[in-house]
Amino acid sequence: MSKFFLYLVLILFLSNCGFKDKKVEQNPNAITLFEKSKPIEQELNPTLNIKISTITKGEPFLSSNSNNSGNLDFNSNFENAFSYKFSTIDQFKFNQPEILFTEDNSLVFFTGKGEIFKTSTDFAEYWKVNHYTKKEKKLKPILYFAQSGPDILVLDNLSKVYSIKLETGELNWTIESKVGFNSNAKIIKNSVVAVDFDNVIRAFSVKDGKELWNFDTDNPFIKSQKKLSLVTKGEVVFFINSIGDVTALNANDGSLVWQTPTQSTLIFQDAFTLENSDIIFANDTIYFSNNRNEFFAIDARSGVLKYKQTINSSLRPTVIEDYVFSISKEGFLFVIDDKTGNVLRITNIFKKIENKKKQIEPTGFILAQNKIYVSLNNGKLIKLNAVSGNEEGFYKIGKSRINRPNVFDDGMFILKSN
């Protein structure tokens, strides 16, 4: 059996600038609201140039509540790289583990046995701790992080919730929840919130781990392994469950603001195959897509559908000004006019790739200084011009899957399997 490792790859650069189930009656004359469509595999207006003038300030990957990274202030020649090697993380593709970037300019991640480590941005190790029993280590827990001042909140897929000190990794407190967690975690109103495998969102006190509130949504018998996501804005938390219901809650008490289903009730019989992208918040709108050829823009204030497009993607989209960017599983870059919901341009990002013996798929993307960096499941990174959609570079990071790039403190961080 071959050994499996994950690496963190840091690329440095010199920059010029700093509800309950609903019964459905069958009616032969009824209008179909949830139509199935085929993936789009042809270009549209490929020579159209778009204008982008906004550069995102600050560190969008540092405690981002919106999940929208925008147009980052980043550029690189990809000549300098460092790596940090650590052990197996199971189901790398579905669990989609994320690095925690901290307010003291360091990063925190975990190994396959639940060991948590903290390093500098050039991988000088500060500390490494493990707060799991021998039995728990064998279960290879998946960890989700969030920072609250001097502490790191940790939630895992085994149902543990605990707090450790950012400076030392020392344990502050630990509790057991009812079910393991399957989403990213966010800090809001002195609480940490996340969604569990039963499609229940829970809020815990960052001080002692006491559960403050929870909210149940529909829960299919067969569980999906695809990681779920949530975002926060003001005193509202938005999340998507495994059957595609988008819910907005009052973060103070977990009371319902609105809920919008995006799939028919028939989805219950095959909910485990549904893969939604991470949701993002921008322009008072919730955006996401799925592997059923659907892209949604939902009004964050009312839950009303603003528009829907045909995009076959489970990758996190990005919004810059009035442009929405998404990349389909088939390798087509979509640019949507957010004001009208119309697709402005579709570009095939794989058209210059000659050897396609292996099924090549994008795994994520970011935008930076009007460039788009697309990670692939074959270990490559494509650089595109966001204005024109043309390819500008092709870089080999590894030989197998790499995750969506992250940018922090003048470096690009990439998780890869090998």
Label each PLM-derived region with a short phrase.
Residues 41-113:
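Beta-strand-rich domains and repeat architectures in extracellular enzymes and scaffolds
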Residues 117, 162, 202, 211, ...:
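WD40 beta-propeller blade core
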